[in-house]
Each structure stands twice: as structure tokens, then as C-alpha cells.
């Protein structure tokens, strides 16, 4: 690693040394020597020593069941410690001094000034800025909450050690604490013994809000204001809401039978309880601070004459929040509430108005510095979190709504709605939506499945407007899918409009998105209720699983572009909701590059994007890291709107159409067309064993008896990442590029790389995937776990991977992958030394596991789970 990363190198070395001491104390010298020998063999193997490679295979294959767990844990925990050190590096003083990121807000405003950008235009764009992060429960978040807490404490220790004026005694105290935390982690079982419930997942999300985002959001808003003020010459408005937090935890029931209406209600109560708790802590501290006696005449007229007027107001709020806490505590405990709704805080304005009055009075009385202290932080939190802490999305699969309405129409003698033509469905739905009479008879008893759908809608009806952000329909394919949800909400007594969001996921659905939305917008009733605002969700995971990365990316781009043009023509404000994941196969890319590769004008109403599991932890898990993430998002959105990327040239579109068709044919030819593919996939990856790992509450398959098509996109990608073939993220892409170049269109491809962010980002993503892949390791899975007659498939795929790597290198004019980002290349090289043994151990363990699946040794099963989580840590992503 380069000189500027000396602290990172030193931190990794120190953490590794402390882990070694811990292992020595816990397991003894023999185990430590074995681990150290494996590490050296792995390092030499990576350096090209064939003898070391064979010795590594022999050593790992001969480890007893008894010793295999500590060996797996050692490499897994080292990779977790490396992740901690790298996460800290991004916010360290050394990193800040060494790099002035061209992607930061401050650098963007410098460029805007150099280009004489209009102050008025910049101000208008900043005031419209919206970053809405939707936190989702990730079924492959492999790290337990108990360990995450220890990892946060380790990060804090690294921060303290960066102070150069520490005495030797102070340094020793911090290092002893580090050693203790590493020992605590070693003696903690990293594998959950039980699968988390949806409520557990929601509590995990709220813990992240409390421990990181609660501090990060006000800090980011201050940073945004200071940076903008240098350009504008004045402050942004206090009520600015550039960050909004929403959540699928407790609301996403697509394919998860454990998320019920009762769970949704419980999570909503818990969110309000947690919000009251956090605001109560803030308000109690504020009561100590606001001891000033002077206030404005308007403030005195409104709140009366008091010796300490601000404390009077704040203490009243404290009493209301205390009552609010008790009210929701009673609901969560299934007790009759001790206080009435009239005594508690249910609306944001009940908090905002009195505190904003305090803020204005303090400024009018010459106490701006006090107003801009803790009070301003609380106002920012009210703006961004509100008294519900986050808004909730409800998500359900489209056929569940179709089945519910079909059950109703059959009962009332209208026939089977699910069998009707689309025009007939729409006519029926519009007629019922326009009718004042109820559709559902009072004496009707629905099936349990339909009752659950209706109960969920009734829970929505019980909430105040704004608590539920939207209702997302997965696998949306028609206008009737959207109208059906509106009808179910109406029949359940929802008294206000809720945005209903179609999620277009497959290649065919993305291509049809414009047509579906045009049909919807042509419905008079629908145009009347949406108030010229529409949200559409773009699915990245399932489209990539359906058609491969290249075809899916282009379909996503074209769908967004078409929707932007359609809504602009109709005068409708469009918000695009991006269902991205952390991996390339799920739309993942560095945030700044990903946003600037979107179609022009697609971010003018802000960004709404899912943040999942381990990516929440990596990008938002520490306050300083979260501030940097918000800064990158804000910079990219503002740049996309103020300095938009170029429209793709007609010849670029033609090339992308060709690449899409060729790559999709290649991808589907393997995944769908080869009869041996499914048995090969099941043998060559730990896909079957993944279901045994109690990671998330949601089952890995929509249909437990189905094949690859029924497998969720996340475990599909997770399985291929484990065996280092990384197939979903590249299959078809490189081969398609190669074919187009061979047709004599290489010059156009090179121009696309140089001048079109969309295409250059795709190539950069491929390069990252290739850097993490490994054909030799993939071959070890095949030779040990796959029947010989299926080996040809792996050999063909690895040959294609090697050819694709050469194709991408030729485009970037480089001899080695990631040579333009040396610190990332170095990081991957370091991780490989520790991840390789885990991969080889996993091969050995899968072999032992499958030899006698009815009587698996518990140590083998436990060690296998550890290799899965360790490889996930080494790859820095799961699914």
C-alpha cells in the first residue's frame, strides 16, 4: 500500500498481532503455529509458488474436525478486523489530509464557481435536494449484532490511537482495551443459533439509526450549509429536508410469510417508542442548556411570562414525550394505555413549532450561537426523522392482490377476476374505485391469505398520513396491478392517498414500464388522485438474474429514460426508486459513479434507494462514515442536476442494443439453456447449505420446491460469490463486447468508455468483479464437489471469464486489473491471503458435509457456516 496508507497498514498489523495473542491464549501455541503456517503458505501460493499451493491444499485437507473451527475462525475474524481498519481509514485524519476528493461537495461547489454557475439555480437545486435511504433487512447480513457493537468499539479505539500527543500510558490503556475487545469477539459465537424474526431485524435497523444516523444527519446538514454558504453567501433554510429515512423492516412481506399485519403494527409502535425515547434524551439535555431569560415579544405573547421562558417550553415537551413513551410502551406490552392520545406527541409539528419558536426568539435576541447549537440539531432531526423515526414502505407481490380480488369477485358472483383480460380488469377496478358503496360484503369470511392482505391494509388505515411512505408492488406487470392495490386500500378504510409504487424487475417488465405507466396516466380517476406525482421502482437484482448484468443495466437505463420523458411530457413529477444491492449483480457500484451514470434528468426530484444489510453497516454504520456517504450522494445528485451527463449518441445506443441482445442470449443460454446448469450450480456452490445459515427472517426461495428461477436474487449472487466465480456479475458482458469489437466497432466502444459515464461505470464494475474472482479456486470446488461429467461447464465458464478479463484490460489500456486504483488492488491482494484458505476450507467442509448429510459432525457444520461468513467479509459484500 502507498505511503499515505501507512496508518492503515500499521492498524491491520496491530489488530492481527492482537488476534494472534488472543488465539494463543485461547487455543494454545500448536493451533497458532498451524494458523501461521497456513497464512505463510497462502501468501507464497499467491506469489506463484506451486509447492506452497500444494502444501496449502494438503494442510487444509488434513485438519481434524476438532481443530477446523479455530482455524476457520482465525481467518474469518482477521478479515473482519481488516474491514474495521479500512472503514476507519476512510474517515481518518491521514485520509482527509492526503485526499481532497474530487467527488466531495466542497470540490463540486469549487467547480460550480469556476464555471460561473447561477447562484439562483444552485440555491434552487440545493433546496430541492433529497436523499431518501430505504433501509432493508438483508437476508445475507452475516455479522451478528453482538459482534457489530464490538467492531464499533474497536473503531473508536483506532480513532483515539491516531492522536499523536498520546502518552505511553494512554496508548497502553487504549491498546489493552483493543486486545480485550478482540478477545471478547473471539469468545463470542459469530454464527446465530436462531434465525432472526422480522421484529429483530427492525430493532437492528433502529439501533443503526440511534447509534449512527442520529448523530450523522445533523452533522451532514451543518456541513452542507457551510459548504453552500461559501458559494451562495447566505444560509440555507432551517427547515431543509435533504435526508429522509424510510424502512422495509416490518413492512416487506414479499416472499416472507413471517411479516404479518401484527408484525407491521408492532414495528410501527416500536418506531414511535424509539423516536420518543431519542427525542426525550435530546430535550432533557436541551432543558439544561436553555437557561436564558431574554425572549422576543412574540414568544412571550405566545407562551406567557416566565423567568426562564425557553425552559418552560422545553419542559412541557419533555412531559409530553415522557407520556408518549409510556403510551407506546403500553401498546408494545399489550396493556391498556395509561395516558390518552391528547396528552402525547403524534405529529412532527407538535415538536417542531415550539422548538422553532425558541430558535427564532434566540436569534432575534442576539443569541444566534446558542440557537445554532443543540437546538438546531434537534430541529434537523425532526425534519429528517420525525416522530415516527422513519417512514415505512409496505411491499407485497402483485399476484397476492390479484388473488385477493379474485376471491371477492367469485364470492359476489362476478366470476374469477384473475382470469379476466387486462381491459376488463381495469374497467372493473375504475368502476369500483369511483363507487361510494363498499365492494366487500360484511358477512364474508376470506381465506387466511386474503385476510392477511386486508389486515395489512387495515393497519395502514389506522396510521396517520405520512407514517406509511408508499405501497410497493413487486413483479408489477400491468396498470391493473396498481389500481388493484388502490381498491384494496379504499375497501379497508384508508382515508387518504398513499403512493402506490410499481416495481419493474424483469427484462420484459422494464421494457414494458413506459407502456404500463402510459395506460395508468390515461385513467382519469388515477390522474385525479396522484396530484401529478408518481414514484416508480426499478429492480436491479431480479433483472440481472433474469438477463445478465449488461442486458439488465441497459434495460434499466432505457426504462428510466422513457419514464422521465413520459412524465415530463405530462407534467408529472417522477421519483425513481432504485432497488440496488451491494454487489455488481444487484446494481451495486460506487455511489458517485452509479448516480452520474443515470440518464439525464432522472435525479431532478431526488434519489430514493435501498440500502441493505451489510452495506448499511459499511456505508452508514459509523457517524463519520455516514456523513461521508451523505456527502457523496449529495454531490452526485447536485452534479447530475447542475452539470448533467451527456445524452448518449445514436451510435452508442445501437451498440448497447447489440451488446444487450448478445449478452442476454449468452447468459440465458447457460443459465436456462444448459440442462446441466442447475445440478452444476447446486454442486459447485454452497447454495443448498446457505439455507441452513440463520441469516435473515426471509426464506431463500419464493417457492421452496422450485429451481434457479425461484431462488431469490440475493442468495443466487451470494452462492456464486462464495466460490469466487462471481458468475451473475459478468456472464455474457465481456463476450458481447468482444463480438462487437470483432465486427469492427472497437473505436465506438472506446469512445463510449471515454465519454459516456453509463458505459465507463459498467466497465469499471466488471473490472472490480474480475479482481475478486479466482479461476483456480473455482476449479477446486469443481474437482472436489462436482461430478466429472459436469466439469465441462466450469471449464467453459472459467475460459470465458479469462477471455473477458483480457477484453476489459484491452479497453482500459492496462496490463493488470485495478491498476488505476492501486489501494483497492492492494486491499484485494491482502484479503486474498486470508480468504483463499477459507475458500479451500469451505471446499473440504462441503465435501465432508455432503458425504453423509444425515449425520453431519456438528464441528463440520459450524466451521462451514464460519467459512461462509468469513468469505463474505473477505469479499466486502454478500448478496
Swiss-Prot record:
GO CC annotation: cytosol
PROSITE patterns: PEPCASE_1, PEPCASE_2
Keyword Transit peptide among UniProt keywords: no
A Pfam family annotated for this UniProt entry: PEPcase
Active-site feature positions: 138, 545
Free-text function comment from the UniProt entry: Forms oxaloacetate, a four-carbon dicarboxylic acid source for the tricarboxylic acid cycle.
NCBIfam families for this protein: PRK00009.1
Database matches in HAMAP family: PEPcase_type1 (MF_00595)
Family: Belongs to the PEPCase type 1 family.
Name the UniProt record assigns to this protein: Phosphoenolpyruvate carboxylase
The organism of origin for this protein: Haemophilus influenzae (strain ATCC 51907 / DSM 11121 / KW20 / Rd)
Gene coding for it: ppc
Amino acid at each position: 500500500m502507498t505511503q499515505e496508507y501507512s496508518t492503515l497498514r500499521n492498524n491491520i498489523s496491530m489488530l492481527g498481532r492482537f488476534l494472534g495473542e488472543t488465539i494463543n491464549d485461547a487455543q494454545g501455541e500448536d493451533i497458532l503455529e498451524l494458523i501461521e503456517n497456513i497464512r505463510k503458505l497462502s501468501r507464497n501460493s499467491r506469489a506463484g509458488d506451486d509447492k506452497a499451493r500444494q502444501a496449502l491444499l494438503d494442510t487444509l485437507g488434513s485438519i481434524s474436525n476438532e481443530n477446523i473451527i479455530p482455524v476457520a475462525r482465525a481467518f474469518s475474524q482477521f478479515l473482519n478486523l481488516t474491514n474495521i481498519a479500512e472503514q476507519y481509514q476512510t474517515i481518518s485524519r491521514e485520509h482527509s489530509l492526503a485526499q481532497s476528493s474530487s467527488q466531495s461537495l466542497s470540490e463540486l461547489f469549487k467547480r460550480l464557481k469556476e464555471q460561473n454557475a447561477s447562484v439562483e439555480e444552485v440555491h434552487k437545486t440545493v433546496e430541492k435536494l433529497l436523499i431518501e435511504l430505504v433501509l432493508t433487512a438483508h437476508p445475507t447480513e452475516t455479522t451478528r449484532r453482538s459482534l457489530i457493537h464490538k467492531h464499533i468499539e474497536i473503531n473508536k479505539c483506532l480513532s483515539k490511537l491516531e492522536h499523536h500527543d498520546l502518552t505511553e500510558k494512554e496508548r497502553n490503556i487504549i491498546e489493552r482495551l483493543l486486545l480485550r475487545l478482540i478477545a471478547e469477539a473471539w469468545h463470542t459465537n459469530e454464527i446465530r443459533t436462531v434465525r432472526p424474526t422480522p421484529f429483530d431485524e427492525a430493532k437492528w435497523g433502529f439501533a443503526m439509526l440511534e447509534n449512527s444516523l442520529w448523530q450523522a444527519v445533523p452533522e451532514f446538514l451543518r456541513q452542507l450549509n457551510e459548504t453552500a454558504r461559501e458559494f451562495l453567501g447566505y444560509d440555507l433554510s432551517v427547515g431543509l429536508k435533504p435526508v429522509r429515512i424510510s424502512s422495509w423492516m416490518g413492512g416487506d412481506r414479499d416472499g416472507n410469510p413471517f411479516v404479518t399485519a401484527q408484525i407491521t403494527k408492532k414495528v410501527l409502535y416500536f418506531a414511535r417508542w424509539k423516536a420518543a425515547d431519542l427525542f426525550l434524551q435530546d430535550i432533557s439535555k436541551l432543558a439544561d442548556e436553555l437557561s436564558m431569560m431574554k425572549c422576543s415579544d412574540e414568544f412571550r405573547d405566545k407562551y406567557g411570562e416566565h423567568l426562564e421562558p425557553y425552559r418552560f417550553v422545553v419542559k412541557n415537551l419533555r412531559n409530553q414525550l415522557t407520556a408518549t413513551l409510556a403510551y407506546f410502551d403500553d401498546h408494545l406490552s399489550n396493556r391498556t394505555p395509561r395516558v390518552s392520545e391528547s396528552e402525547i406527541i403524534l405529529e412532527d409539528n407538535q415538536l417542531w413549532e415550539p422548538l422553532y419558536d425558541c430558535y427564532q426568539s434566540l436569534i432575534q435576541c442576539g443569541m444566534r450561537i446558542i440557537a445554532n447549537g443543540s437546538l438546531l440539531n434537534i430541529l434537523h432531526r425532526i425534519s429528517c426523522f420525525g416522530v415516527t423515526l422513519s417512514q415505512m414502505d409496505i411491499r407485497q407481490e402483485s399476484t397476492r392482490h390479484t388473488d385477493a380480488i379474485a376471491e371477492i369477485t367469485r364470492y359476489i358472483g362476478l366470476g374469477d377476476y384473475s382470469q379476466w383480460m387486462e381491459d376488463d380488469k381495469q374497467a372493473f377496478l375504475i368502476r369500483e374505485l369511483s363507487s361510494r358503496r363498499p365492494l366487500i360484503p360484511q358477512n364474508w369470511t376470506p381465506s387466511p391469505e386474503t385476510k392477511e392482505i386486508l389486515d395489512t391494509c387495515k393497519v395502514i388505515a389506522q396510521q396517520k398520513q405520512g407514517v406509511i411512505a408508499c405501497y410497493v408492488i413487486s413483479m408489477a406487470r400491468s396498470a391493473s396491478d396498481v389500481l388493484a392495490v388502490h381498491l384494496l386500500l379504499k375497501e379497508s378504510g384508508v382515508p387518504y392517498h398513499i403512493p402506490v409504487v410499481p416495481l419493474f424487475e424483469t427484462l420484459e417488465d422494464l421494457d414494458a414500464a413506459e407502456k404500463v405507466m402510459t395506460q395508468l396516466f390515461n385513467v382519469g380517476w388515477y390522474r385525479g388522485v396522484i396530484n401529478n406525482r408518481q414514484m416508480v421502482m426499478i429492480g436491479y437484482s431480479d433483472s440481472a438474474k433474469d438477463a445478465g448484468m449488461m442486458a439488465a443495466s441497459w434495460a434499466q437505463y432505457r426504462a428510466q429514460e422513457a419514464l422521465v420523458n413520459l412524465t415530463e411530457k405530462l407534467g408529472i413529477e417522477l421519483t425513481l426508486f432504485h432497488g440496488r444491492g451491494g454487489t455488481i449483480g444487484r446494481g451495486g457500484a460506487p455511489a458517485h459513479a452509479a448516480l452520474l451514470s443515470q440518464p439525464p434528468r432522472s435525479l431532478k426530484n431526488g434519489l430514493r434507494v435501498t440500502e441493505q444489510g451489510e452495506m448499511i453497516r459499511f456505508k452508514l454504520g459509523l457517524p463519520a462514515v455516514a456523513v461521508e456517504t451523505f456527502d457523496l450522494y449529495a454531490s452526485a445528485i447536485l452534479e447530475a442536476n447542475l452539470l448533467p451527463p451527456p445524452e448518449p449518441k445514436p451510435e452508442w445506443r445501437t451498440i448497447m442494443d447489440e451488446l444487450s441482445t448478445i449478452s442476454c442470449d449468452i447468459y440465458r443460454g447457460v443459465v436456462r439453456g444448459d440442462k446441466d446448469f442447475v445440478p452444476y450450480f447446486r454442486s459447485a456452490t454452497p447454495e443448498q447449505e446457505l439455507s441452513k445459515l440463520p441469516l435473515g427472517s426471509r426464506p431463500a426461495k419464493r417457492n421452496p420446491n422450485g429451481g434457479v428461477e425461484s431462488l431469490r436474487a440475493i442468495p443466487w449472487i451470494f452462492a456464486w460469490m462464495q466460490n469466487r466465480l462471481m458468475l451473475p456479475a459478468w456472464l455474457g458482458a465481456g463476450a458481447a463486447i468482444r463480438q462487437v469489437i470483432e465486427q469492427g466497432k472497437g473505436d465506438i466502444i472506446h469512445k463510449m468508455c471515454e465519454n459516456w459515464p453509463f458505459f465507463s461505470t459498467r466497465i469499471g464494475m466488471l473490472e472490480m468483479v474480475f479482481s475478486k474472482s479466482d479461476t483456480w479456486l473455482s476449479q477446486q470446488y469443481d474437482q472436489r464437489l462436482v461430478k466429472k461429467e459436469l466439469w465441462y461447464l466450469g471449464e467453459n465458464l472459467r475460459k470465458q471469464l479469462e477471455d473477458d478479463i483480457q477484453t476489459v484490460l484491452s479497453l482500459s489500456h492496462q496490463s493488470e486489473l485495478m491498476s488505476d486504483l492501486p489501494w483497492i488492488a492492494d486491499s484485494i491482494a491482502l484479503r486474498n491471503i486470508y480468504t483463499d484458505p477459507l475458500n479451500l476450507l469451505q471446499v473440504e467442509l462441503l465435501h465432508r458435509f455432503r458425504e453423509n448429510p444425515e449425520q453431519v459432525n456438528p464441528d463440520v457444520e459450524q466451521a462451514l457456516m464460519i467459512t461462509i461468513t468469513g468469505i463474505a467479509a473477505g469479499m466486502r459484500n454478500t448478496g
